[in-house]
Every structure is written in C-alpha cells, then in structure tokens.
Amino acid sequence: MPDWLAQLLITLLKAVLVAFALLTTFAYMTLIERRLLARMQIRVGPNRVGPLGLLQPLADAIKSIFKEDLRVTLADKLVYTLAPIVAIGMALTAFGGIPAGPPKSLFGTDPWVYNLDAGILALLALTSMGVYGIFLGGWASGSKYPILGGLRSSAQMISYELGMGLSILGLLMLVGSTSFLRIVEWQALNGWLILFQLLGFALFLVSSFAETNRTPFDLPEAEQELVAGYLTEYSAIKWALFQMAEYVNMITASAVMATLFFGGYRGPVFLEGLIPGISGWPLIWLILKIACFLFLFIWVRATLPRLRYDQLMRFGWKLVLPVALANTLLTAAFLAFGRGAGLWLLGLLSLAGLLLLFALSDRVRALWNTPTQRRGAETAWVRPLGGDG
C-alpha cells in the first residue's frame, strides 16, 4: 500500500474516532447538564430511563430520529436542510486540530487529525464559519423570529470574535508561534500561560461563552423574546444537529482554553517530580481539564441571568475589545523593554490589570446601561418611605 494512501486511511480513521467521541460526549453532556441543573435547583432531574437514568440520551436520540420532520411552507428547502449540516460540520472539524498527546503517542501515530502551524488561526476561522449555519437556518425558515435570532448570532459573533482574537494575541507574541503543539511545549518549559496571561484568559473565557451562545449570552435563542430564535421552525433530527453543534462547540472551547492556558495534555509541572510516570497520562489530563470547563459552562447557566441585547453589544465593544487591546499592548511592551526582568513581572502586571477591572466594577456595570438609565442613576435621590419626593 502506498504511504500516502496509508496516511489518508489513518487520518480518516482518526477523524471518525474523534467524531464518535465528540457525539458520545454530547449525548451524555445533555444528561449531566440536566442532572446538575436539577440538583442546583433542588429537583431530581431525568432518572427513569435505564439504571440511574443513564439511557436517557439513547431515548432522546431515538425520539429525535423518529419524530416528524415538519417543513415550513415559506422555507427555502435546500438552505433550510443544509444549515444544521454546516453548523455541526464546522464544529466537528474545528476540534480535529487540538493535540491530545505528544507526537507518535497514539499507537505510533500522532494524536490529532490535522496539525497546522497556524492551528489557532485555523480554529478561529472554522468556529467563525459555524455562525453561517445559524444565520442561514434563521433566514431559510421564512419566519420573523428565526431571522431575528440569526441576525443576533451574526452581530454577537462579530462583536466577540475581535475580542477573542486580541485576547490571545499577547499569548501568541509571548510563545512566538500559533501552533497548538508548540504552545504546549512552551508551557512545559516555562509554566502554564494562565500565570502570565491571566487578563487574557479572563477575556477569552467571556468571549467563549459568547461564541458558543451559552448563558448569559444565549441571545440568538432567547425563549422569552424570540420563542426559540433560529430554532423556532426546526424539529426532529435537524433540531438535534443544531444542539449537537452547540455542545461540540462547548467541548472545543473547553479544549482550547485547556491547551492555551493550562498546559494542554500535560499535567502540572510540580507533580511530574512527585508522581512517577504522570507525564504518560496525556489524554487523561486533557479530559480532566475539559471536564472542569464544561462544569463551569453548566454552573454559569444555572447562576447568571441573560443579558439584554444592548448590554451584550455594549459589553463586547466597550469593555472586552479595549481591554483585550490593552493586554496586547502590555505584552508587547514587556517583550520590548522588560524581558530581562523575568516572566513573573508580566504575570504581576496581568494580575494588576484584572484587579483594576474589579476595582472599577461600578464603572464597568455602567457600560451595560443606556444613556437615559445612566443619567437617571446620576440624578436619583433617596426618597423618604411613603413620600412623594
């Protein structure tokens, strides 16, 4: 067998395995999320299908497959059908570039589907293209609520994609590469990048919630405002494909944060000298880090209310983008003038920037209000109880 054909078959096999792992994780993520939300809300949650409710994802899958696939009269049939395929296709493709271990550690092959020198840029491009599935699904439905949800998704993606890119630009300048593998190797030598880019991580985390359309940024499908947003006219397997795309994007965002800021598939450096062979558990470390971020996504959904649309846009353009730009300039200044002082200085500066944001939290909160609300807050007086003013 020619080498190129063998390599192609191996790549296809790895792609199938990654897709299977992601879709299986999605299925049980829905169950875990429902059970955790129920526990946080003092409920029981789904526990009737199978032992301890573990077959609930299978029941949901069977139900979605065999439900009637309704078609809207005014819908564009081709685009209406292709939109969920585009969404899930981009989500699955984006995850394939994230390394799950060192080179040649997966039965003599590389533990990734593809490895690009511009890996992080390719991933940002793929995740950005996923919004086309949402927008096209809303537009093709031929209904006002879906098109509003699609437009919201497009505006939200544009607003937070810039901040997300700038939030990791300082990290990329520090490492000197856009390859995921080299970023992990750099952290093995110098320490996790969360220590030196704390402000960038906070901005990337917020942008990840917005990019995945999760609470408090789930405006494209706001039930109280848009029925179900871009999902209003979808049912059966098409609706399930959109849900798959959302959860796969959550998993991808968690894997990216683990890789960029927490050492990726490598365990904590201080443990490598204490526990023999700990560096031989790359996949386990990556899964544990992804699980922590997925729990954070669920926790935030159970805790925070949804932002208004004007608050969402104002927060992205007036806070996330300027602070991300400031973090980039701070890192550039350190590389130009303070490199000799050591990386700890950059970590302290990043921590100081984050603490400054918390200290100015009242000013930050004012960005969420409209000009009329801000003027009202400035001129308000405490009125006596029961008085007319």
Swiss-Prot record:
PANTHER family: NADH DEHYDROGENASE SUBUNIT 1 (PTHR11432), NADH-UBIQUINONE OXIDOREDUCTASE CHAIN 1 (PTHR11432:SF3)
UniProt record similarity statement: Belongs to the complex I subunit 1 family.
Cellular component, GO, one term: plasma membrane
UniProt entry keywords in alphabetical sequence: Cell membrane, Membrane, NAD, Quinone, Translocase, Transmembrane, Transmembrane helix, Ubiquinone
Catalytic function, reaction form: a quinone + NADH + 5 H(+)(in) = a quinol + NAD(+) + 4 H(+)(out)
Assembly and oligomerization: NDH-1 is composed of 15 different subunits. Subunits NuoA, H, J, K, L, M, N constitute the membrane sector of the complex.
Residue ranges crossing the lipid bilayer per the database entry: 8-28, 78-98, 120-140, 157-177, 189-209, 255-275, 280-300, 317-337, 340-360
Protein name: NADH-quinone oxidoreductase subunit H
Organism: Deinococcus geothermalis (strain DSM 11300 / CIP 105573 / AG-3a)
Function (record text): NDH-1 shuttles electrons from NADH, via FMN and iron-sulfur (Fe-S) centers, to quinones in the respiratory chain. The immediate electron acceptor for the enzyme in this species is believed to be ubiquinone. Couples the redox reaction to proton translocation (for every two electrons transferred, four hydrogen ions are translocated across the cytoplasmic membrane), and thus conserves the redox energy in a proton gradient. This subunit may bind ubiquinone.
Enzyme class (EC, first level): translocase
UniProt-listed InterPro entries: NADH_UbQ_OxRdtase_su1/FPO, NADH_UbQ_OxRdtase_su1_CS
Gene Ontology biological process terms, A to Z: aerobic respiration
Predominant localisation class: membrane
EC number(s) from the headed UniProt entry: 7.1.1.-
